[in-house]
């Protein structure tokens, strides 16, 4: 019998709008403790019902003293539950409990060195008294509330951490959830285990049992359709749904003509033949390309592709009859990149944007609370072949957003062939599981070259390869020069109309992983 959430220790994170907020949830789950990101104005009654071991206030872009600043119900401080405030969360707790918060004369953005004033304080116990952290604030606490001690400081932030051990209230001005804070994970562990007394009793096996039970309760005897791309997200979604409801699921594999080389056939073999998922394959390449003619704006391309997907689903659903649910492989990172109630939109995501208002299906998103690496772990637990689980992340719009500008069949062929060479050589070099994501893009730039005895004026191919844990932040992958050189040689010699290769050495942020 599947367990309920009440059976697990949990720490909830209240969302005040930081783009890092879901990383906090991710880190807590890494410790084996269940965690969810919830609205900042979550009711006291709901908090009591959830009975968390601890509460974390996330960071955010507001100033606590401004009109319209995001707040919490003051009763939250009377629940007897440990609280950790991060950045804005620390300022809010200080402000609400009688401390002072003011605009900083010297703002801190980026790496900073803090000095731990009280090495015996619960959060810093056993850690170095000098450590680098990641700061991102324009305000600071200038007076701690009564009953609090200052436990850390930095050059521009005299009150960088505070503690009230009696009430188990703690605050840090820096972002412990970001990997740039060298002992950030230790600080979060101290809060979760030492302060909150939580027990690590949450596993992916538990998630499977709970999600299967939840899907069965929600779907009942109704039918579900799923848009299948062949990527990790949709493949794991299909397998999880198949485990829960069997043949009530029909996966609609919309081949929009923007897939990677041979991907369509590989999808059919792995999921339909080997795993038994019921799949209908729809060849819609011409339809999609006609809709994309003359379109160059990336947001518009995403919207068109998303809308066309749903229209295909509607048509296929009518053929199937009595379909009530549309499943999607939406992840936590998809949701945050499309903005939440408190976070600014970075770009509309293919899984959560472009849905028509008159959509005839109820939406079911069983992976919505998971990050990419958790999805891979889930896939392995479900018995999906290793090669499929570790397939490179692939956006719903496919190669359509890796061709910058207008999408044509000829341009898709260039990207598809160059991408296949890149993937083949990365695998030969044994780097396929060391690099989080890698692909080629066609920027639409032509340049002069010399091939044979003649002058050429052909396309440039960009190579993008990054290392990451969860897609929230990423660094460019340091592929050995000889491997990059060989990839370049092969692409310019084997792919028509290409005479130049460039390598993207930008991190996320400031760039996103995809170029569009």
From Swiss-Prot:
Manganese in keyword set: no
Enzyme Commission numbers on file: 6.3.5.2
Swiss-Prot/TrEMBL keywords: ATP-binding, Glutamine amidotransferase, GMP biosynthesis, Ligase, Nucleotide-binding, Purine biosynthesis
Origin: domain of life: Bacteria
Pathway terms, separated by semicolons: Purine metabolism; GMP biosynthesis; GMP from XMP (L-Gln route): step 1/1
GO cellular component, one term: cytosol
Pfam family for this entry, one: NAD_synthase
Catalytic EC class: ligase
Catalyses which reaction(s): XMP + L-glutamine + ATP + H2O = GMP + L-glutamate + AMP + diphosphate + 2 H(+)
Domain called GMPS ATP-PPase: residue spans: 202-391
Gene3D superfamilies associated with the record: 3.30.300.10, 3.40.50.880, HUPs
Classification via InterPro entries: Class_I_gatase-like, GATASE, GMP_synth_C, GMP_synth_GATase, GMP_synthase, GMPS_ATP_PPase_dom, NAD/GMP_synthase, Rossmann-like_a/b/a_fold
Coiled coil: none
GO MF assignments: ATP binding; GMP synthase activity
UniProt keyword Repeat, yes or no: no
Domain Glutamine amidotransferase type-1 span(s) in chain numbering: 10-201
Binding site for ATP: 229-235
Active site: 87 (nucleophile), 175, 177
Subunit and interaction comment: Homodimer.
PANTHER family for this protein: GMP SYNTHASE [GLUTAMINE-HYDROLYZING], GMP SYNTHASE-RELATED
Protein name: GMP synthase [glutamine-hydrolyzing]
This protein's encoding gene: guaA
């Amino acid at each position: 019998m599947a367990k309920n959430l009440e059976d697990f220790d949990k720490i909830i994170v209240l969302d005040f709008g930081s783009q890092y907020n879901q990383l906090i949830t991710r880190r807590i789950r890494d410790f084996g403790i269940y965690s969810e990101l919830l609205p900042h104005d979550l009711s006291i009654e709901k908090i009591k019902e959830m009975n968390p071991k601890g509460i974390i206030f996330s960071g955010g872009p507001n100033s606590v003293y401004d009109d319209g600043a995001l707040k919490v119900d003051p009763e939250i401080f009377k629940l007897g539950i440990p609280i950790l405030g991060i950045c804005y969360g620390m300022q809010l707790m200080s402000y609400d409990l009688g401390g002072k918060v003011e605009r900083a004369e010297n703002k801190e953005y980026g790496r900073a060195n803090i000095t731990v004033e009280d090495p015996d304080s619960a959060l810093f116990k056993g850690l170095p008294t000098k450590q680098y952290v990641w700061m991102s604030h324009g305000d600071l606490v200038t007076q701690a509330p009564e009953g609090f001690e200052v436990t850390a400081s930095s050059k521009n932030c005299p009150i960088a951490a505070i503690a009230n051990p009696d009430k188990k209230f703690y605050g840090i001005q820096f972002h412990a959830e970001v990997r740039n804070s060298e002992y950030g994970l230790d600080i979060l562990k101290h809060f979760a285990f030492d302060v909150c007394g939580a027990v690590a009793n949450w596993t992916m096996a538990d998630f499977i049992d709970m999600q299967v039970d939840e899907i069965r309760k929600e779907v009942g005897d109704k039918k579900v359709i799923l848009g299948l791309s062949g990527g990790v997200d949709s493949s794991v979604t299909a397998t999880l749904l198949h485990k829960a409801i069997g043949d009530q699921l029909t996966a609609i594999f919309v081949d929009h003509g923007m897939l990677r080389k041979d991907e369509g056939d590989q999808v059919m073999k792995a999921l339909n033949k080997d795993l038994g998922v019921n799949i209908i394959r729809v060849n819609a390449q011409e339809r999609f390309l006609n809709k994309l003619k003359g379109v160059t704006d990336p947001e518009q391309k995403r919207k068109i592709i998303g809308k066309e997907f749903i229209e295909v689903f509607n048509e296929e659903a009518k053929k199937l009859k009595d379909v009530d649910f549309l499943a999607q492989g939406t992840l936590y990172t998809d949701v945050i990149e499309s903005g939440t109630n408190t976070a600014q939109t970075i770009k509309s995501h293919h899984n959560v944007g472009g849905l028509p208002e008159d959509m005839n299906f109820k939406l079911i998103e069983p992976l919505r609370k998971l990050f990419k690496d958790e999805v891979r772990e889930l896939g392995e637990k479900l018995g999906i072949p290793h090669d499929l689980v570790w397939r490179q992340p692939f956006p719903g719009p496919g190669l359509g957003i890796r061709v910058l500008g207008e999408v044509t069949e000829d341009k898709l062929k260039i990207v598809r062939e160059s991408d296949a060479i890149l993937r083949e050589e990365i695998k030969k070099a044994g780097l396929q599981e060391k690099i989080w994501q890698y692909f080629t893009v066609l920027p639409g730039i032509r340049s002069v070259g010399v091939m044979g005895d003649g002058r050429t004026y052909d396309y440039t191919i960009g190579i993008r390869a990054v290392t990451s844990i969860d897609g929230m932040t990423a660094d460019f992958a340091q592929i050995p020069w000889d491997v990059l050189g060989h990839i370049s040689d092969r692409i310019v010699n084997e792919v028509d109309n290409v005479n130049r290769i460039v390598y993207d050495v930008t991190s996320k942020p400031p760039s996103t992983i995809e170029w569009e």
